[in-house]
Regions:
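Bacterial N-terminal signal peptides that target proteins for export
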Residues: 1-8
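Hydrophobic helical h-region of N-terminal Sec-dependent signal peptides
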Residues: 9-14
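N-terminal signal peptide c-region/cleavage motif recognized by signal peptidases
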Residues: 16-18
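C-terminal-biased regions
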Residues: 24-49, 53, 57-137
Length: 137
């Protein structure tokens, strides 16, 4: 009887293994969220196409990346915009596909990958904003 119990237990555990081994489900944005982001990114891309640093600063969460030296639009335009939004990155952001995901704090984010740089756009209480860049590793 003890042997039969062990065999049944082993069979049950083997049967459950694929359930735990499955890849996590990929996050999918709701149609409403996607529509909101599409509207935002259209305006963001138009500002980049015009090389309008003031408009981009207005669509950016400040202080940028929690850096107190980039706490307002003037500082963003002077320090960050020229360094991050090179002609190459502006062109990439025009054509780059945005990828949706949720972060560990359950925030809705879209990412656009441009070479070694990731551009992050986050849903905030006031709508979507450009929130940070990161290294594409």
């Amino acid at each position: 009887m003890q042997l039969l119990s062990r065999i049944v237990l082993a069979a049950v555990l083997l049967h459950l293994t694929p359930v735990f081994a499955q890849a996590p489900k990929k996050a999918v944005a709701s149609p409403e969220l996607q529509k909101e982001f599409d509207g935002f990114v259209g305006k963001f891309r138009a500002a980049l196409k015009a090389n309008d640093s003031a408009a981009v600063a207005g669509m950016t969460r400040l202080p940028f990346m929690a850096d107190s030296s980039i706490r307002d639009a003037a500082q963003f335009r002077a320090k960050t915009y020229p360094a991050i939004f090179t002609a190459k990155h502006r062109a990439c952001l025009q054509r780059g596909k945005a990828v949706y995901d949720r972060d560990g704090e359950n925030n809705d984010n879209y990412f656009i990958f441009c070479g070694q740089t990731i551009f992050v756009f986050t849903k905030t209480p006031t709508g979507f904003l450009f929130t940070e860049t990161g290294v594409n590793d």
